[in-house]
Amino acid sequence: MLFALALIPVIALLCFIYFNDKKEKEPIGLLIGLFFAGIGSIIPAIIGEAIGQAVLNVIIPYNSVIKGYIFAILIVGPAEEIGKYLMLRLITWKSKHFNYSYDAIVYAVFVSLGFAAIENVGYVFMNGIGTALLRMFTAVPGHACFAVFMGYFYSKSKYAKLTRNGKAAGYTALSLILPILTHGVYDAIIMGARESDFAVFMGLSAMLWIGYVIALFVVSCIIIVKSSRNDYCIVTLPGDLQTVYRPAVAGTWKCECGTVNYFNYCSECGRQRPANNTTWNCPKCGTLSSYNFCGNCGCPKPGPQQA
């Protein structure tokens, strides 16, 4: 009973994320591997938190609200989110299946909910059904929210790397910093309140935490819905037509639905950018394309005199 209660929210969220992948479903084997990688990431998280807590106890040997904040934001958040990110990066960055923007959110959530699953099982078996019901609507969806932020910028980092637009480092930093901060603040509000003896402060902290959790859920759902709706191909597939290009080089195009787009797919209806009737190989890098510019290096399509 407790085991089922611990895993029900995990399974529900995984299904929600998976079935919002409209363009191209990810291989089940890859997703299972990511889930178990997330479970494995709890080991470095435990070690990191133990070391961080030992150091913090030396620096601040007494319990206080400030100590709770520091522990949550500077130790718990980084220890858990960096471990998840490393698993995500090692498994998916060079994967041939990572070819659509929404894929990154799917990958990140599967890793994060693997972590959440094993953590939730432990908490539920230690504290009982009340904890199971509370975490079903807070901690487990919270881990999914942190992963949505991570995946959103992880996808942008991959796209920036492929298109060489100079923004990859910034997006990579955001894919780590934002989950760490949102996770750290989530825990800090709780941990700070636990260290306080003032009922008013504890009550205000509880209200702040509830508002923060609701805001996390709303923003994450908006990102999921928009990312799913605007999902676009981000890579060049060997042997296939060009599927990614620099928006500044390729220019805009007007879809049949009337939407003006920069990217490969219409953000409103999902139609693909119209291709030319003929394909060509880039004379500089050899990439196969059906557009007027090479998406790999930006070289314009050769004219008749160059053919």
Walk through the language-model features, giving the residues of each.
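Hydrophobic alpha-helical segments at protein termini of multi-pass membrane proteins
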Residues: 1-307
